[in-house]
């Protein structure tokens, strides 16, 4: 059994135990009367290509992901939240870089706070760290990635603007920023359509990490620019179960970056690509 399968089994057992141990509404009168509240979500999905959180297109072949998202709310004191994700490439086309059964784990922990401006508008802030151990690599690069992330969004029923920054701390250093807007549309009680568009900008160190060369010119000291537009249809087919389908269009915006991708011989060196995702999730 692979490591990610053990992880999924452990997560499911832990979630079941916590759900059973959690007091019910009848036992507490109201859940909101307790100081803290726990919630989580388990999901499994298949993607036609893999786009990393750094804004980099890492693979253009099918990928499987298993995710655990969790949050502990402390009333007016904010929340602790995070995630754990196992990623597996469903092929061995990059075996010269990774072991044939390629499995990668990424996890993060954050603190977030909602500042309620009106009944409908909330200003969210979140910050924390990401841990990405690169175990099992064949090329001798078994180091661990440490990243810092910071989030802000203006949550509202109309059009939510958001931005976040991701900074690689170790090994090496680079920074990327993402700015975007999103909106959810309730089609029925069970169906929700989500739409978003965002752009990613990276400094010259991020540019060099992707393309292996210095940028020819520097806009705000960098030239790594990409964009993603997406649609997701979510179906709540049971009280705690969701199924979803997602389509995204990824584009490289920087002209020199597009030329650098074109010169590459790697099969995953694509300047633009449509990415499709199918998934199922359980909330607890």
Q: What are the functions of these language-model segments?
A:
Residues 21-94, 281-283:
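Short glycine/proline- and aromatic-enriched beta-strand/turn motifs that initiate or cap beta-hairpins
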Residues 39-43, 79-83, 122-126, 158-162, ...:
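Residue-level detector of the transmembrane beta-barrel scaffold of outer-membrane proteins
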Residues 43-51, 85-89, 112-114, 128-134, ...:
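Outer-membrane beta-barrel pore domains and translocons
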Residues 44-46, 66-72, 109-113, 129, ...:
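Residues on the lipid-exposed face of transmembrane beta-strands in outer-membrane beta-barrel proteins
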Residues 72-76, 113-119, 153-158, 185-189, ...:
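Outer-membrane beta-barrel strand-turn architecture
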Residues 81-180, 264-266:
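Outer-membrane pore/translocation modules
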Residues 141-221, 225-228, 232-235:
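Detector for outer-membrane/organellar transmembrane beta-barrel domains
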Residues 195, 227-284:
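Predominantly the C-terminal beta-signal and adjacent terminal strand-loop region
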